[in-house]
Regions:
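Extracellular/periplasmic helix-loop-helix junction of adjacent transmembrane segments
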Residues: 27-126
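Helix-breaking motifs and short loop linkers at transmembrane-helix boundaries and internal kinks
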Residues: 140, 161-166, 178, 195
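Conserved MFS/SLC helix-loop-helix module at the cytosolic interface between two early adjacent transmembrane helices
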Residues: 127-163
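Residue-level signature of mid-helix packing/kink "hotspots" within the transmembrane helices
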Residues: 24, 122-130, 180, 214-215
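Helical-face signature of the major facilitator-like transporter fold
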Residues: 12-16, 122, 156, 164-168, ...
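Cytoplasmic helix-loop-helix junction between adjacent transmembrane helices
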Residues: 171-208
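A gly/Pro-rich, aromatic-decorated transmembrane alpha-helix motif that marks the paired
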Residues: 208-220
Length: 221
């Protein structure tokens, strides 16, 4: 097929963008500041908060409710509207951060846990890059890419079953094992499909896709 090598590099660029979206999800959703408009009792669109003595009932746009003591919330005015800000995210959803911690203690705990997860992810990622290079040489790029994508796809699915720091770290390590393969795999693929005078361009497109994934991750997530 004429020009098939360019279709191949486009597909590799696509999975590379997805790769970096996957990688960034935990970082951007680990702890998030969610704004709630203080309501006078009327249901409003979007997130809103109802005062209940010393607590606020936080109502998400999807109807989910959460009761939080007012001391745990940040109150401010935005565009002439009173709002409260609640810290949420994966770390809180998994119960990894105690609600009794102060804001400074909670921030430190969240940072330390994310750092631990990232370290183990990168250990798995580095080991996989060494092993994947040999694997792709042995079984070829088609099978190699298939194994890598299946592995990190399974890691993504299993991450939804995480129930604590240990399981989440394990699934992130699995993600690292799967995500690392395309780097040596792309180098091999470019050598197989592109003439020598076009290989630098192909490799540059691959690198640009990695940067693009990092750029759009915070926008999409």
């Amino acid at each position: 097929i004429k020009g098939i090598r360019w279709w191949i590099i486009v597909l590799i660029m696509l999975i590379t963008i997805i790769n970096y979206l996957d990688r960034g999800t935990l970082n951007y959703m680990w702890v998030t500041n969610i704004e709630y408009v203080i309501s006078d009792g009327q249901t409003t669109s979007g997130n809103y908060a109802l005062k209940d003595n010393d607590n606020y009932i936080l109502v998400k746009s999807n109807g989910d409710r959460l009761t939080v003591h007012e001391s745990k919330l940040i109150s401010k005015e935005k565009n002439g509207v009173d709002i409260v800000i609640n810290k949420e995210g994966i770390a809180y959803d998994l119960g990894l951060i105690s609600p009794d911690l102060s804001e400074e203690e909670a921030a430190k705990a969240a940072k330390d846990m994310l750092g631990t997860i990232t370290i183990f992810f990168m250990i798995a990622y580095g080991i996989s890059q060494l092993v994947s290079g040999k694997l792709y040489d042995k079984i070829g790029t088609r099978k190699g890419f298939s194994i890598s994508v299946l592995l990190w796809g399974a890691a993504d699915a299993l991450t939804s079953l995480s129930c604590g720091l240990f399981s989440l770290t394990g699934f992130r390590m699995m993600l690292g094992l799967g995500e690392a393969g395309p780097w040596p795999g792309t180098t091999k693929s470019n050598a197989e499909w592109f003439p020598q005078k076009e290989r630098a361009l192909a490799q540059g497109l691959f690198g640009a896709a990695a940067s693009l994934g990092s750029i759009i991750a915070p926008i999409i997530i």
